[in-house]
Amino acid sequence: VHETDIAAGRVLVATDASDRPVGVACVQGHAGEVDLADMFVDPPAIGSGAGRLLFEASVVLARGLGADRMTILADPHAAPFYERMGARFLRNAPSDAIPGRLLPLYEYDLTSGASS
């Protein structure tokens, strides 16, 4: 997450009932296509609905930016989550952080009625 993304209102934070942060997501890009970047849910909060809320809020934000698709370079352990959200697997793509590592790349169609 970059300071410019925070200033632009593109960073979303999920909190628990005590208002403690349990997850974060960042939408980066421009009209047409955006990336769901840096989405993370604290392991104890997995299964609480925080990930779904972050994903759905990211979809709303991306649509507000005028995007018609959102790409997601996912952690392999999170791949089933993105598939449940309706994202479509495209291919394996190089990791931005770890040279030589391939990660599943997904696409979410923002023109559909899902996750609105």
Predicted regions, residues:
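Acetyl-CoA-dependent GNAT
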Residues: 1-38, 42-44, 55-56, 61, ...
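C-terminal "cap" of GNAT-fold acetyltransferases
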Residues: 12, 68, 73-77, 85, ...
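A generic "binding-loop/recognition-motif" signal
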Residues: 32, 77-78
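Active-site acidic-Proline motif in GNAT/NAT acetyltransferases
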Residues: 42-44, 48, 76
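Short glycine-rich hinge loops at helix-strand junctions in the catalytic core
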Residues: 49, 66, 86
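Conserved acyl-CoA
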Residues: 53-69, 80
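Short beta-strand "wing" residues that participate in macromolecule-binding interfaces
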Residues: 89
